[in-house]
Amino acid sequence: MLEPIYFSLKTPSHDTGSGALFSVGVPLPKGRFFAIQQLVCCRDDGKDVSAAVVPKAFWPDNSLKWVLVQGETTRQGLEQAGFTLCEPQQIPPYCKQQSPDITTTPDKVEVRCADTSWLIDTDQLFSGTLTVAGKLFQFGVKSKFRAPYDTLQATLSDWHITPSYDNKCSGEAVFIDLTLHYQLISKTPATMPLEFTVTLKYFTHFGHCELHSTLLNPNPAEHAGGTWDLGDQRSLLIEDFGWFIKAEEGTAHLSDDNATFTSAEPIHTESMLWQRSSNGQHWDSPVHLNHQRELSISNPLSVIEVNGEKSEQPVRLMPAGNLQQGETGLRIVPHKFWQNFPTAFTARSGEICWHFFKAEANHPVELQPGEQKSHCCELAFSVNAGRYVKATARLNPEWVTHCAVIPWFSTALTSDPLQSLINLGQTGEQNFFAKRERIDEYGWRNFGDLYADHETAEHQGDELFPSHYNNQYDPLYGFLKQWLLSGDEQWKALADDLARHIIDIDIFIMGYYINIMIKIFKCFKS
């Protein structure tokens, strides 16, 4: 009997790149492979795959249980191809793995790889220069916090780099994680330093990078009146907080498929795309009340101001920005932009800024003690970026069943009588996405949370009655299980959004968050 394929890949049909980049967690059966063995990723149609295989979890006998596979392959025939892991048929020649090219000084950290170089200041908040194919870009963070955090001293408290190597024996790292931990120290000794973490995840030779950021308020809460509510004295009140990148000789462009403006012209005046609400039917939902029990949104319409033309439109923005220097370009695409309002994209000649938070006047964002907020965007740079497309991976449910990594998981579950009821979570009138709209489960704190509408059974009246699940792990596990069984990316999206909300908002112990992706989720998440 032939062993089933481990996973398959799919790319968007509208993209024109010839190569596919992928990152996927893959399970392995107990006793099959050990860390000492060199594993390669193979396509069943024989086409070339360049991939790094990194151990992530082990069975009790120390055999590999989960590995992270990150790599690149041609898009030719990809839709029909299957992927497996195996030992190479021929023992590859000895090759010394090269450490990333790093230079450190008391005030700088420089990381060079392929045609890019990050030169990072240690005494400023994620600030420095990015050099791509010889072209220089400057980047940094803009912030406007209210007292006692209005005057902060930033310092790079810790950083580390994790390289991954492919099976080609070139010796070069093909994938790098660079993580930077900052402390933002207030002049008020009664408050603990805020924490800001940046992780750059990039394919070194392919011009693609993900920028992940997390802002944490680690201070203990007062719990006035024995409650955990808004308005705590140690809350961080944010008026503006964002990351910018610029080039003195560059030109900037903004684009958005949902907004009406002329995007072909380069930016030559102050321009802005500002998402102030979800612009949904229930944008004024009680979930958006502030500590004074007042609505934190005064005007729901999105602001579109480009090259002097300004309008307010009821749209859900999904912007992208381009910064061009000659033939070298940099493209910035935020993830889940409108869902995490209030947020904005601004630009001027030669500069683009993504405002993680941009609050309305007199409605600052309140990051409570114990809360954090994470954001992510994609960066595409260098002449290679347009040649590659990010692929979506699907694990083969037969292989997951064979590996026995998830208790009671079986492809036979799709024929269970309960499956038709479970499917209503996607297709029913009260599916999970419809519930989001009903309560307007959007905004930076709410997005990903689940509306517990079953608790409204005895509610009288027409007004919305917000309530949320407190056993978040059950639906998180369920969403992932349904994704594995069906391959439906909607289940995976629900799991990703919920897990991010749990990590950022719901879990806090001893002043620090516990990353509770659950071992299963850690392995799924690329």
Predicted feature descriptions by range:
Residues 11-37, 226-248:
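Surface-exposed beta-strand/loop patches in extracellular or lumenal glycoproteins
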Residues 65-88:
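Intrinsically disordered, low-complexity Pro/Gly/Ser/Thr-rich segments with frequent PxxP/GP/PP motifs
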Residues 466-484, 526:
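Well-ordered alpha-helical segments within folded domains of soluble proteins
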